UniProtKB/Swiss-Prot annotation:
PANTHER family: HEN1, SMALL RNA 2'-O-METHYLTRANSFERASE
Protein name: Small RNA 2'-O-methyltransferase
Keyword vocabulary terms for this entry: Cytoplasm, Magnesium, Metal-binding, Methyltransferase, RNA-binding, RNA-mediated gene silencing, S-adenosyl-L-methionine, Transferase
Subcellular localization, as worded in the UniProt entry: Cytoplasm
Binding site for S-adenosyl-L-methionine: 78, 114
Coiled coil: none
Length: 394
């Protein structure tokens, strides 16, 4: 829950001793986190594929956005090249993202440059965010900003946040919230500017904010005011021939690509690993069944109604339809000391089916990593393989 409360200045350090009779505002969660969460909620709802953060600074927002599976291109632009160099590492893939890769490719790039310069590599984006950016622009740059962002880049959606000057009297000794701010607008000033921009470039705009004022001060509005611009018609317009000409004025400072299941090497690695786990589970179960048969001195089929259902070996819960597909597929079998698991059987297990739904495709991906039967229809392993992995013991 978002809250704002008055805290005595003496609780916040020596910097405020001269105004200790005053109160200051503390937001929970912190205001910057509320702004980032607002963007994350938009991404959840609209699932953009291409997202750019103008004035990305320390790249904290980009780091939060890179986890979203819908995003395939994530770009940050900032005028401070040193910040980009020092924070690029935040966006590198973690080890876990190689072990459990994304479904879709993701490329992350940081550019050094001004947000009022045109660069054709930012054309065709679904979402552009400008979080606490415009108040840092001087009057000339502010005048150029709408034409570049809304006119030239023309994304499907733009989010702009900026301080609400009407909230400032609630802070002790505050005129502008940052020494680099060139201005801070009231709600009327921001909404007038934003509405004019929207009308000029064929957008609609809605106003909201984050940072709820403390009780008794509701009349000042949110601490941070936000405009959400959506392109009328809901579709991205095709760049014109002149726009499509390469205009690369930004300097690429950092770029990285994430492993994904769209990359054949990655898909093969994950598929083979999951397949070997499933094969070993079935092999171990068959060994137990043979031991039980020896004890009872009577032959039994590989699977009976009284034995544990094969789908339970996966350590997961399945729908009735999934169980039926597994149980109705070709059964594993033995020939001497060799254990055969049909590919059609393996394809019925949801984890493997998600990775590969086609028998021919699975065969081509695993052929040089596992032993296949002479006709290529089954994986073949030694029944009494000494592999130490025991997934059912976990």
């Amino acid at each position: 829950m978002e809250t704002a409360e008055n805290i005595p200045c003496s609780m916040l350090g020596d910097n405020f001793k001269e105004v200790c009779a005053e109160k200051v505002i503390r937001f929970r969660p912190p205001l910057y986190k509320q702004r980032y969460q607002f963007v994350r909620d938009l991404v959840d709802r609209h699932e953009p594929k291409k997202v750019a953060d103008l004035g990305c600074g320390d790249t904290k927002l980009l780091k939060l956005l890179k986890i979203y599976p819908c995003i395939q291109l994530l770009v940050g632009v900032d005028i401070n090249e040193e910040k980009l160099h020092s924070n690029g590492h935040r966006l590198s893939p973690y080890l876990g993202e190689f072990v459990k890769p994304r479904d879709l490719d993701l490329t992350v790039t940081l550019y050094h440059g001004s947000v009022v310069e045109r660069d054709s590599r930012l054309l065709g984006f679904d979402l552009i965010t400008c979080i606490e950016l415009i108040e840092h622009l001087d009057s000339d740059d502010l005048a150029r900003f709408p034409e570049v962002v809304f006119g030239y880049l023309s994304p499907a959606m733009v989010v702009i946040s900026t301080p609400n000057a009407e909230f400032n009297p609630l802070f002790p000794t505050v005129t502008l919230r940052d020494a680099d701010h060139k201005f801070e607008w009231s709600r009327m000033e921001f909404q007038t500017w934003a509405s004019q921009v929207a009308n000029c470039y064929n957008y609609c705009v809605e106003f909201t904010g984050v940072g709820t004022p403390p009780a008794g001060s509701e009349h000042v509005g949110y601490c941070t005011q936000i405009g959400v611009f959506r392109k009328n018609g809901g579709k991205l317009s095709e760049p014109s021939a002149s726009q499509q000409r390469d205009q690369h004025v930004y300097k690429a400072v950092y770029t990285t690509s994430y492993p994904s299941l769209q990359q054949e090497k990655v898909l093969k690695f994950v598929l083979v690993g999951e397949l070997l786990i499933q094969v070993d589970r079935l092999r171990l179960r068959h060994q137990r069944m043979l031991r039980e048969q020896e004890k009872e001195r009577g032959p039994k089929p590989w699977y009976t109604d009284s034995s544990p259902a094969p789908h339970l070996l996966l350590g997961a819960v399945f729908t009735e339809a999934e169980k039926a597909r597994i149980e109705n597929s070709p059964k594993p079998f033995c020939e001497g000391e060799k254990f055969y698991i049909p590919l059609q059987r393996l394809l019925t297990y949801p984890k493997l089916h998600r990775l590969c739904a086609d028998e021919d495709r699975m065969r081509s991906l695993i052929a040089d990593s596992v032993c296949l039967s002479s006709d290529g229809s089954a994986v073949v392993v030694d029944l009494h393989n000494s592999w130490d992995y025991r997934p059912e013991d976990n």
